[in-house]
């Protein structure tokens, strides 16, 4: 396998700290990073270089663990170990914290906007997932507290085109939720990982979900049978593929490219890997191959990988070493 990941640039994003997470805005013109230094940094392209456009340093008292852009690109949400979630509004080049969401008992581990932009999900070490509703006046109201997990909840992500929410937990499981008669309910539990599930990502259609774990595997789950049209019966999610034997340590993040279908992973062995579904593989029993492997992508654990929303071959990663890196992926011939 020839080396198909090329380093474009490396940036010291959060010096002397961990860089925890990266998020592209919907148009791909800005990249938000967050870290153990309690800041969020907004990066933009200046010629060929990524430069820091602004530092959001006033919102949080502790580590900022995750950031998420609203679908319109005008708001950024940040989840922090200080048990709060800040909502930042973009005004020209600057960002202003317009509200702080409180209620979790301790560290907020993740935050995610629904595709509609009117719902926000947060999750915490307090084992709960909260769903917030946003109205026209930019007021945020908690509409549901979900206590389905028995341990720390690490990550939340929304289905790309329906209001279905997924969460990953230290209890080794993944839960799916949807709204039912004005309340949110857990509609499925995905079990199979043998240790903490760190992250998860839907494919472009939302029919498949990739999950990654402390058990060193990535699992691909597929939605089978959605019941009769219009019926309320829950789709059945089944593990259709397990990527095992590739990662030597915890897999901290997985990201599904919505333009090409390639899957990127971030691992505790300091490496970034790319997987692609094999041509002609059976959708109900898909097979994937490792198509790129960058062993020393960073000098410490890789925490996050994220594909650019518009440029199909551009990937960003970040690490405990405080750096973020930009990669060009070339599909092997």
Swiss-Prot record:
WD repeat start-end pairs: 14-53, 59-98, 103-142, 148-187, 192-231, 246-285, 297-333
Signal peptide span: none
InterPro entries assigned: CIAO1/Cia1, WD40/YVTN_repeat-like_dom_sf, WD40_repeat_CS, WD40_repeat_dom_sf, WD40_rpt
GO cellular component: cytosolic [4Fe-4S] assembly targeting complex
CDD domains referenced in this protein's UniProt entry, alphabetically: WD40 (cd00200)
Keyword check for Repeat: yes
Protein family (similarity comment): Belongs to the WD repeat CIA1 family.
Protein name stated in the entry: Probable cytosolic iron-sulfur protein assembly protein ciao1
Taxonomic source organism: Xenopus tropicalis (Western clawed frog)
Record lineage: Eukaryota, Metazoa, Chordata, Craniata, Vertebrata
